[in-house]
From Swiss-Prot:
Keyword Cytoplasm recorded: yes
Organism: Saccharomyces cerevisiae (strain ATCC 204508 / S288c)
Intracellular or extracellular location(s): Cytoplasm; Nucleus
Gene3D superfamilies given in the database record: Potassium Channel Kv1.1, Chain A
Name recorded for this polypeptide: Uncharacterized protein YDR132C
Superkingdom, taxonomy of origin: Eukaryota
Length: 495
């Protein structure tokens, strides 16, 4: 039971002049909520009105049509008590609000109950305060959280799960009460999210600007949490990346995992505004050309053939660039990493060509990223489906797998095969004794067959993607490869 001090003797000037004159400010009213009796002034009731209370007591003040009974009615009104069958505990908070105090909300249960009764009593100012509060209140994994809204000030972190929830659930309840003219608000449970409370604490730490030590497993777990809560800026900040400046091409480069790329960040510079290193030219990526290059480099230094070669290959490719959503102001040349054996380099002995075979999850991700995001060229936009093939799975022979067989350049690649560093890639390409594998020949897309060649299965690899004249080429930057079953099992680790 709560009793406020008598304020009938206080003057009109004592009250806030912004309080509307709905009820007499100096008059005291009695309201019993549950088992508790509250005495409250007209000024306090008028401070948040019009409301259920101001309408009720205003009607009681209206004079009766029977003048003889006016005095009796006014006398009875002095002793009248408004009975309300609601929670006295919740009304205690509302009582403090009407008296001008700030309500310190502790958790999601208090917030939900307070919001429901603010609707029930039709308190417009309290409803507005609750909707515009500086915090979100929720329960995650059994632990209550009071989340400051300014943690989501960065672009991409809003709108998020909490903002959308607050903008829909509570507003829907409000509209339901108003439209259906319900006597009381429908029962509504406090928000509960069945996620890890420990991971969410880490997210709050990062949102607040602090840093924490993360291994790969925890980093991936937090990225999943960011996607669940729609914290897109924080997700990008958690994704592993490396930015560097290439002094040869005089361009910035960014390295990311293929699985972490977003279609929104993919861009290509205009052909006229970009000229790459001559070593990215496709002729350098055939077996014959590597052989001729090897011979060329054996020529005396005073020969002019190097200058001629530079002029011959001083053409431009459109290199794939990437701009991280919500973080980067300008795009950088992209190097993407594939961390699985979904990627295989195929060297064809007959056609003297090099392709990279991408399959499995990497193929699906590759298609999702580049299926409709390749730029137009004078020869038309490259079509990824032109490089798509479907073969039976090697394991079951019944499941059909999608393969992307794309022209590749490995001349610049820092290549490690079977644990041995290959210092000169052209020596590998010109050693015909190594070409004993059975590989797919895609020289004629309408007549696929197998031929002799060399397969390099990649454990990890770094790539650039280039486009020119409607064609696509993948440029290997760094790769760890194996060739053969024994070498594959060397990569096994004990449990």
């Amino acid at each position: 039971m709560s009793n406020s001090p008598t304020v009938a003797t206080l003057s009109q000037e004592y009250f806030d002049p912004n309080i509307p004159q709905i009820l007499p400010h100096e008059k005291m009213y009695k309201i019993q909520v549950g088992k508790s009796l509250f005495k409250i002034s007209g000024a306090s009731l008028s401070s948040d009105g019009p409301s259920f209370f101001t309408e009720y007591f205003s009607k009681k003040r209206s004079p009766s049509n029977n003048d003889d009974s006016n005095n009796d009615t006014m006398e009875s009104n002095k002793n009248e008590v408004l009975f309300i069958d609601r929670s006295a505990e919740v009304f205690e908070w509302i009582y403090q609000h009407l008296q001008g105090y700030i309500i310190e909300i502790k958790d999601e249960v208090q917030y939900t109950m307070l919001f429901a009764d603010a609707m029930y009593y039709n308190l417009p100012r309290l409803r507005s305060l609750l909707k515009e509060t500086d915090y979100y209140f929720t329960n995650i994994g059994g632990q209550s959280f009071k989340i400051a809204k300014n943690l989501f000030r960065r672009e991409g972190d809003s709108p998020n799960y909490f903002e959308i929830y607050a903008a829909t659930v509570y507003i829907d309840v409000e509209e339901l009460i108003i439209s259906k003219k319900l006597l009381r608000p429908p029962s509504h449970s406090a928000p509960y999210i069945p996620r890890s409370s420990e991971y969410f604490k880490d997210l709050l730490t990062l949102l607040g600007g602090a840093s924490i030590d993360l291994d790969d497993n925890k980093r991936n777990a937090l990225i999943k949490e960011c996607r669940y809560y729609r914290l897109l800026n924080l997700e990008q900040r958690l994704i592993k990346s490396h930015i560097s400046y290439n002094p040869i091409t005089r361009k910035e480069e960014i390295c990311l995992l293929l699985k972490d790329l977003s279609k929104k960040g993919i861009t290509f510079p205009a052909s006229s505004a970009f000229s790459t290193s001559p070593y990215f030219e496709d002729d350098f990526c055939s077996i014959n050309e590597c052989d001729s290059l090897s011979k060329t480099r054996e020529q005396p230094a005073n020969k002019k053939i190097k200058l001629d070669m530079t002029e011959k290959y001083n053409d431009s490719w459109n290199m794939l660039c990437y701009k991280r959503p919500f973080l980067d102001k300008h795009p950088r040349e992209l190097i993407f990493q594939i961390n699985s054996t979904d990627c295989t380099i195929i060297l064809n002995k007959e056609s003297q060509s090099i392709h990279v075979d991408i399959t499995g999850e990497s193929a699906y991700k590759f298609e999702a990223l580049f299926g409709s995001h390749l730029p137009n060229t004078p020869s038309g936009a490259p079509k990824l489906k032109n490089y798509q093939y479907r073969f039976p799975s090697d394991s079951t022979q019944t499941k059909i797998e999608t393969h992307y067989l794309l022209p590749a350049c490995i001349y610049l690649c820092d290549l490690d095969i079977n644990g041995i560093k290959i210092s000169q890639v052209q020596t590998l390409l010109t050693d015909k004794n190594k070409f004993n594998d059975r590989v797919i020949d895609v020289s004629d897309p309408l007549d696929l067959r197998f031929c002799s060649g060399l397969k390099l299965y990649l454990r990890k690899s770094l790539w650039k993607l280039a486009v020119k004249d409607g064609n696509i080429m993948l440029i290997a930057i760094k790769a760890i490869a194996f060739n053969g079953t024994k070498e594959y099992y060397k990569g096994y680790e004990y449990l």
